[in-house]
Regions:
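Noncatalytic, beta-rich nucleic-acid-contacting surfaces in large DNA/RNA-processing enzymes
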Residues: 1-182
Length: 182
């Protein structure tokens, strides 16, 4: 028999989760995506509900799914709900995103964690956060010098996600660009 105390604990936990989902939705989604959604892929989920639904349909159309795909499907369903409620994600940003937490930027916006990018591990993310606190990166070259745990593959991942758009590739100044008035 299932003890009543366990049943009561499960009911209390379900009630608390439901309360947060209704009354503090951004806190709920921040915690859910940061803790309960290991399959969160910022490259996919931060690009809008249309892409989320397309991937959901693709996974639902498969007869057999792996455990990773099942986790992805659950995460996609919660992301779809997130978008339907009028919320949005910002792109991953090396200056704003935390290592492994989703940050609440305002009542409508979550900033995904650095580790939500596939291929960007916790050690590299921590290294980036530690170094950004010491000062801005002058270039991706500077990032590679200052962050020994960041590889060229991580830089490619960040570049593909648009997280390095405002940072030049090298520390060298282009004389022609400087003279043309940029």
């Amino acid at each position: 028999m299932f003890p009543r105390a366990h049943a009561a604990a499960y009911v209390m936990m379900a009630y608390r989760i439901a309360w947060f989902k209704v009354h503090q939705p951004m806190a709920f989604y921040s915690a859910y995506f940061g803790i309960r959604a290991p399959a969160f892929d910022a490259n996919l989920m931060c690009k809008g509900d249309g892409l989320v639904m397309e991937k959901t349909r693709q996974l639902q159309g498969q007869e057999k799914r792996t455990a990773v795909e099942e986790d992805m499907l659950t995460t996609l369903e919660v992301a779809h709900e997130f978008y339907r409620r009028g919320y949005r994600f910002t792109p991953v940003d090396i200056y704003k995103s935390a290592v492994d937490q989703f940050l609440i930027l305002d009542n409508q916006t979550l900033a995904p964690s650095l580790t939500s990018l596939p291929g960007l591990g916790e050690a590299a993310a921590r290294n980036i956060v530690e170094e950004r606190e010491k000062g801005k990166f002058m270039s991706t070259e500077d990032m590679l010098l200052r962050c020994p745990k960041v590889t060229k593959g991580v830089v490619e991942t960040l570049t593909a996600a648009g997280a390095l758009n405002d940072i030049p590739k090298t520390n060298q100044i282009d004389l022609f660009e400087m003279l043309s008035g940029s």
